[in-house]
Amino acid sequence: MSTSTGSRVADDSHLRAQHLQKSYGSRTVVKDVSLSVQKGEVVGLLGPNGAGKTTSFYMIVGLVRSDGGGIQMDGQDVTHMPIHRRSRLGLSYLPQEASIFRRLNVEDNVRAVLELQTDESGRPLTRDAIEQRLTDLLHELRVEHLRASPALALSGGERRRVEIARALATQPRFILLDEPFAGIDPIAVIEIQRIIGFLKKRGIGVLITDHNVRETLGICDHAFIINEGRVLAQGTPSHIVNNAEVRRVYLGEHFKM
């Protein structure tokens, strides 16, 4: 699959975690978590505080080493790979905290990532190719009008869009979003949901963990609910919302989408 900015996603692309386990001392926080993300699929990883969802997410990202189980990306075992090697294989991670260069403007933030990329033959991108991809990304993420704006002047929603543009500059197969709806206003939430839909249309698999349940379920194709270190339930948002056990331990009886 190709796009105007050069993203290439394999037809059989998938990210899969199987039987993940993690303990800290005598406390086991992740007992048995398995999940998968296919190309062009938006998956939510949700659950109560302390359930093990964040630790599971960080194991998939590569920030936390698993004690058991495995992680595969497009059939390749990445369980013990550090985050930078997973990134080279096509896994992009957007942390909750600001990840843009605060002293650069918007276009230089994206250009800095593009200058590290190579073409299909492994050669550095030409200046013309960099500038074309830069223009395409700024347009697609609707930040073209901000290209000369300093990063420090961006709102929370604008910053998120620039961060996603930077992530797309690496031509990822999967993007893992940590709390993408945190600290932004309702209008920006709608814009982030639109962008996630845009990633899906590009064939990129998206894994989201967030405390904002409605916003996350509102964009997901599939969700996994983690409780007490295990997968309590999985399925479509409708299935999750109507699951009696999920309502009892997580959503509450009066939850509505």
Short names for language-model regions:
Residues D77-A98, R123-E131, K201, V241-E245:
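ABC ATPase NBD coupling module
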Residues Q171:
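Conserved catalytic motifs of ABC-family nucleotide-binding domains
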Residues I175-E179:
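Catalytic Walker B motif of ABC-type/P-loop ATPase nucleotide-binding domains
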